C-alpha cells in the first residue's frame, strides 16, 4: 500500500515550499488509494513550539489536506511527535552500537571546530575524520572519567558509492569517502534528523518519501542507516526547488512566503492548491485551472519536472481572481465581511438587509478582485464622498460645458422619483440625456465622477442603486 507522510518541524508557519510538499504527498496518496500521514518533527527543542504546530495543522486544514493518520488523528503508529518517540531512537541506536555500525564519540565542540577549520584551510570539505572511531575500552573509560558526554556516530563505510534511484531525478551517486562519520544521537539523547527520519519512516511503513530537492544530500546517509538496520528503503522522489521570477531562491521580495499570509489576504484555498500543484508538476495540455478532484485524478510523479519551479505571483492572482468570479456571490460576500469590518466600513453582525447590501457591493466589484483584501479599495466609493482630490482625467470631465445642467437635471429626476433601483437609474439617465440632447460619455462620465469620484469602476447603474436615492441626490447636489 502507498503510505506517504508530511513531516514539518514546528519552528514557524507553513511556508509555500512545505505546503507544496504536503500537497504532492496528499495527491499521491489520494491518486493511488493510499494513506497520508502527518508527523511532527519537533526535536529542535529550542525553536519548536506547540503554537507553530497548531498553525501548521490549521494551514493544512485550510488547504483541504486531510490526513489519515498523525497528530490529532491517531493511528496504528502512534505517537506521531518525535519528542514522544525518543525511546525508539535510543533503542535502534543501541542496536547499531552493538553491531559495530555506530560508536560513541567524545569530541568536544571546540575540537570539532578546530578540525573543521584545519580542513577548510587545506581546501578540503569539512567532515569528521574519525578521532573516536576506533577507541579502545581503556580510552573510552578515560574520556568518560574526564566527564565528557558521548554522542553516537554512524560508522560510514570507506570506498563505497551509494546509488539513489530517485523517481524524479533519476539515478544519483554519492561517494562515501567525502561524507565523514555522522552523528545519529546527540550527547543530550536527542536524535539527529537523518536518524530519526529513518526510524520513523520504517516504523510507520512509509512507502514513498516525496520531499524537496534540498533533502537529496541527506539521502545517502539515510540509505546507509536503512542498510545497517537491515531494513528496506522506501522509494525517493525529490521535487525541484521553488525560485522567484528572477530565478533566485524564493524570498519575501517575491511575495508572501507563509500560507497563512495568503489566507489573511483573502486568497481562496482552492486557488492556492491549484497554484501549488503547478509548481513543478504539469498535467499536460493548456488547461491550468484544475479542481481538487481533477488534481487527484491526474497527479503523478512521472509529470514532476526536474527543473526549478518558478513562483509567479501574477499567475496566482489570476487563478485566485478566476475562483472568486466562479464562486457563489453568497460565499464571496461572506469572505468580504471581515475585510470591510477591518476597514471600518461595517460592523458585524450584519442584519439581513445589511448583508444584502454587501452582496450588491461585492457583485459590482468582484470582476476586479485578485484577492479579497482588494475589496476594501474597490468598495470605498460606497462609504466615502470625499472627492476633493480628483485625478486629471476626472477634472477634465467635470470641466465640460454641459456638466452642471446634466447633474442638476439628474438630481431633480432622482429626487422626484421612487426607490432608486438599477432599472430606475438607467431610466433616469436616459430621460435626462433625451431632454438635454446629450448621450453616451457626455452624460455617463460626469455622473460617474460626481457620485464615485472616479472615471472608471463598477457599472454606473449599480453604483447609484447601491448608494440609494438620498445619497445620490446628496452627491449630485455638491456639483450643482
From Swiss-Prot:
Keywords, ordered alphabetically: Aminoacyl-tRNA synthetase, ATP-binding, Cytoplasm, Ligase, Metal-binding, Nucleotide-binding, Protein biosynthesis, Zinc
GO (cellular component) term, any one: cytosol
Principal location listed in the UniProt entry: cytoplasm
Needed cofactors: Zn(2+)
Residue interval(s) of motif 'KMSKS' region: 249-253
Classification via Pfam families: Anticodon_2, tRNA-synt_1c
Family assignment from sequence similarity: Belongs to the class-I aminoacyl-tRNA synthetase family. Glutamate--tRNA ligase type 1 subfamily.
Protein name, UniProt field: Glutamate--tRNA ligase
Lineage: Bacteria, Bacillati, Bacillota, Clostridia, Eubacteriales
Gene name of this polypeptide: gltX
Amino acid at each position: 500500500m502507498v503510505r506517504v507522510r508530511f513531516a514539518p518541524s514546528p519552528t514557524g508557519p507553513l511556508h509555500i515550499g512545505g505546503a507544496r510538499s504536503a500537497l504532492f504527498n496528499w495527491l499521491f496518496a489520494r491518486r493511488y488509494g493510499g494513506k497520508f500521514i502527518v508527523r511532527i518533527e519537533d526535536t529542535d527543542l529550542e525553536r519548536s513550539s506547540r503554537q507553530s504546530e497548531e498553525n501548521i495543522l490549521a494551514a493544512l486544514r485550510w488547504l483541504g489536506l486531510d490526513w489519515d493518520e498523525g497528530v490529532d488523528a491517531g493511528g496504528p503508529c502512534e505517537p506521531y511527535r518525535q519528542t514522544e518517540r525518543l525511546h525508539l531512537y535510543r533503542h535502534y541506536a543501541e542496536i547499531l552500537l552493538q553491531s559495530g555500525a555506530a560508536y560513541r564519540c567524545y569530541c568536544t565542540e571546540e575540537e570539532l571546530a578546530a578540525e573543521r577549520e584545519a580542513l577548510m584551510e587545506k581546501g578540503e570539505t569539512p567532515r569528521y575524520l574519525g578521532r573516536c572511531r576506533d577507541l579502545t575500552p581503556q580510552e573510552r573509560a578515560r574520556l568518560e572519567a574526564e566527564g565528557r558526554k558521548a554522542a553516537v556516530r554512524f560508522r560510514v563505510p570507506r570506498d563505497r558509492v551509494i546509488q539513489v534511484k530517485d523517481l524524479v531525478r533519476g539515478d544519483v551517486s554519492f561517494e562515501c569517502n567525502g561524507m565523514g562519520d555522522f552523528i545519529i544521537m546527540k550527547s543530550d539523547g536527542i536524535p539527529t534528523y537523518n536518524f530519526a527520519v529513518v526510524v520513523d519512516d520504517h516504523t510507520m511503513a512509509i512507502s514513498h518519501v516525496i520531499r524537496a530537492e534540498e533533502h537529496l544530500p541527506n539521502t545517502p546517509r539515510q540509505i546507509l542507516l536503512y542498510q545497517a538496520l537491515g531494513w528496506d528503503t522506501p522509494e525517493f522522489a525529490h521535487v525541484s526547488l521553488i525560485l522567484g521570477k528572477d530565478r533566485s531562491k524564493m524570498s519575501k521580495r517575491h511575495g508572501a512566503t507563509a500560507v497563512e499570509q495568503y489566507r489573511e489576504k483573502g486568497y481562496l484555498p482552492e486557488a492556492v492548491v491549484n497554484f501549488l500543484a503547478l509548481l513543478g508538476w504539469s498535467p499536460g495540455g493548456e488547461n491550468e485551472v484544475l479542481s481538487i478532484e481533477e488534481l487527484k485524478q491526474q497527479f503523478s510523479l512521472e509529470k514532476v519536472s526536474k527543473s526549478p519551479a518558478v513562483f509567479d505571483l501574477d499567475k496566482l492572482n489570476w487563478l485566485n481572481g478566476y475562483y472568486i468570479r466562479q464562486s457563489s456571490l453568497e460565499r464571496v460576500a461572506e469572505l468580504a465581511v471581515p475585510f470591510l469590518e477591518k476597514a471600518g466600513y461595517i460592523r458585524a453582525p450584519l442584519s439581513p438587509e445589511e448583508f444584502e447590501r454587501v452582496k450588491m457591493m461585492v457583485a459590482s466589484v468582484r470582476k476586479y478582485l485578485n484577492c479579497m483584501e482588494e475589496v476594501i479599495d474597490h468598495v470605498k466609493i460606497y462609504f466615502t464622498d470625499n472627492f476633493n482630490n480628483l485625478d486629471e482625467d476626472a477634472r477634465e470631465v467635470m470641466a465640460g460645458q454641459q456638466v452642471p445642467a446634466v447633474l442638476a437635471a439628474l438630481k431633480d429626476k432622482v429626487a422626484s422619483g421612487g426607490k432608486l433601483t438599477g432599472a430606475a437609474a438607467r431610466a433616469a439617465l436616459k430621460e435626462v440625456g433625451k431632454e438635454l440632447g446629450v448621450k453616451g460619455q457626455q452624460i455617463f462620465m460626469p455622473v460617474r465622477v460626481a457620485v464615485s469620484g472616479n472615471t472608471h469602476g463598477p457599472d454606473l447603474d449599480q453604483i447609484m442603486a447601491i448608494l440609494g436615492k438620498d445619497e445620490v441626490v446628496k452627491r449630485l447636489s455638491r456639483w450643482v
